[in-house]
UniProtKB/Swiss-Prot annotation:
Annotated protein name in UniProt: Putative ankyrin repeat protein R760
Matching SUPFAM superfamilies: Ankyrin repeat
Domain of life (superkingdom): Viruses
Disulfide-bonded cysteines: none
Keyword Repeat: yes
Ranges: ANK repeats: 67-98, 100-128, 129-158, 160-188, 189-218, 220-248, 250-278, 280-306, 307-336, 338-366, 384-413, 415-442, 443-472, 474-500
Entry-linked PANTHER family: ANKYRIN REPEAT AND PROTEIN KINASE DOMAIN-CONTAINING PROTEIN, ANKYRIN REPEAT-CONTAINING PROTEIN-RELATED
Keyword flag Repeat: yes
One matching Pfam family: Ank_2
């Protein structure tokens, strides 16, 4: 870093939040006196800075020619609105002349008339950059500075009358009134002044501009569009009273009021003819993504499709439980959307959604078992009297059945019923599992008949190799009728073996 003397004084430009900066633990930037005018844009106060080089925690940095430190001492405070501060800097060696234009613009922006007069004494042309200083004063609403500039020959009509545009944009009603006296065109730049007065909610100013010829319909009724988008209810109401077209731009005003959740404005626009149907379902999806329950309820009440799969997906993916409840309140049939909701809830681990579905008497356990989702079943508090186990076995989900059995010692299962259906469905693994439990089926002949009917030779072999003297006459007849030669041969062989034994 550059060398500096032990007692060298540095400078920092600070703003109105200076006390917050002083108490901060952030890195502090400062400068030498020869660069101080380059930092005017950062505030309206000047602090003299010394460096606590004897502090063992002190660190000094240089970044792209900028000086900063983690610890500094704040000394004398100067007001940059006071010409004496600039005199002091010049006396200390600061070269002000190369910076006069920037100082002029900075002072005009802040309304520091004394500083403007100060740099004027140095011979600076107040009209530099096509009277830009005057436009900056209008932007800030510094009327004393505006009047001073006009008295000293600056033209308020310079740059296509843009002074009135800035004055209106930033809500400076009195400044606009001053400028109009000098015959500025309030419709300049496509009615910029009115458009931005409406954008920022300045009703009194907007009314004044309209009374003086500003066009409320400029830019395809931009005024009511932007006022609606920005949430200015009273401005929207005022513009409607002045004849603004609420349907302009394919109901732009209503569309964006809804997108910003300004329902009170949306209702106002609809009252005067705006059509909500244009983007109804798209806005519902967007509102769900924002988790805006008020807007979703409003759209649902106005006919939006709450059964839209994108809506359901969005709500469950983001775990918006209150939003789901809102849709139910407005007519969503949970049972009809059960598969979509539970599939996403399972994938995203949304237990609160699953618990809510259970509270609404949706049989989530049955759904999980039917689809063979062991991971999902494990997410559910299991209260099963045996039906879930039976269903899992009949559908061939042995892992789920074993889990349910492990979670409930007080279950009742009709294993004979399960055995018959397992044989019918050809569930070899389930049949073997049931037999391994040393259960004794009560309807073996019936099970054999179902296995034969559906062509499950492997099931027949398991049963008939274990049990003797099973009546299979009907099954032999079925095998002939169904043209199952392998099954027929096996059954006849079983019958012959019985007779031999």
């Amino acid at each position: 870093m550059d060398c500096f003397s032990q007692n060298e004084v540095f400078f920092m430009v600070t703003n109105t939040d200076e006390d917050i900066i002083i108490e901060s633990s952030q890195k502090f930037f400062f400068t030498r006196i020869d660069n101080v005018f380059d930092f005017l844009k950062y505030g309206i106060y000047l602090r003299e800075i010394t460096l606590p080089t004897n502090n063992t925690n002190f660190k000094l940095y240089t970044e792209n020619g900028k000086l900063s430190a983690n610890i500094i001492n704040f000394d004398v405070k100067h007001k940059l609105s006071d010409p004496e501060t600039f005199d002091y800097l010049v006396e200390k060696g600061a070269n002000i002349k190369p910076h006069l234009v920037n100082i002029l613009f900075w002072a005009s922006n802040h309304g520091f008339l004394n500083i403007i007069k100060y740099v004027h004494k140095y011979g600076i042309d107040l009209r530099t950059n096509n009277d830009y200083a005057l436009r900056l004063a209008c932007k800030g609403g510094h009327n004393n500075v505006v009047k001073f500039f006009i008295r000293n020959g600056l033209d308020p009509k310079a740059s296509n009358d843009f002074a009135i545009c800035w004055a209106a944009e930033f809500g400076h009603y009195e400044t606009v009134k001053i400028l109009i006296k000098y015959n500025l065109d309030i419709t300049t730049c496509s009615n910029y002044a009115l458009r931005y007065a409406c954008k920022n909610g300045y009703i009194t100013l907007a009314n004044y501009l309209i009374e003086n010829g500003a066009d409320i319909s400029a830019g395809d009724n931009y005024c009511i569009k932007i006022a609606s988008e920005k949430g200015h209810y009273y401005m929207v109401n005022y513009l409607i009273s002045k004849g603004a077209d609420v349907t302009a731009g394919n109901n732009y005003a209503l569309n964006f009021a809804i997108k910003k959740d300004y329902i009170f404005i949306a209702k106002l626009l609809m009252k005067y003819g705006a059509d909500i149907k244009e983007y109804l379902n798209d806005n519902l999806i967007d509102a769900c993504r924002r988790n805006s329950i008020v807007t979703v309820r409003f759209l649902a009440e106005n006919g939006a499709n709450i059964n839209n799969s994108v809506v359901i997906t969005t709500i469950v993916q983001h775990n918006y439980l209150d939003m789901l409840k809102c849709l139910v309140d407005t007519g969503l049939n949970l049972n009809s959307k059960k598969h979509d909701i539970l599939s996403i809830a399972r994938d995203k681990g949304r237990t609160t959604i699953i618990e809510y579905m259970m509270s609404q008497n949706i049989d989530v356990l049955r759904w999980g078992i039917t689809n063979g989702y062991l991971d999902f079943v494990k997410m559910i508090p299991v209260i099963d009297n045996g039906f879930g186990i039976e269903l899992a076995l009949i559908l061939g989900h042995l892992d789920i059945a074993k889990y349910l059995i492990s979670q409930n010692s007080n279950y009742q299962v009709d294993y004979d019923y399960v055995f018959r259906w397992s044989c019918r469905n050809g569930l070899t693994v389930i049949v073997k599992f049931l037999l391994s439990m040393k259960m004794e089926p009560q309807s073996i002949s019936y099970a054999v008949e179902w296995a034969t009917e559906n062509g499950h030779l492997d099931i027949l072999k398991i049963i008939l190799n274990k049990y003797m003297n099973v009546k299979i006459g009907k099954s032999i007849q079925t095998a002939r009728e169904k043209n199952y030669p392998e099954i027929l041969d096996f059954l006849i062989g079983y019958l012959v073996k019985q007779e031999v034994d």
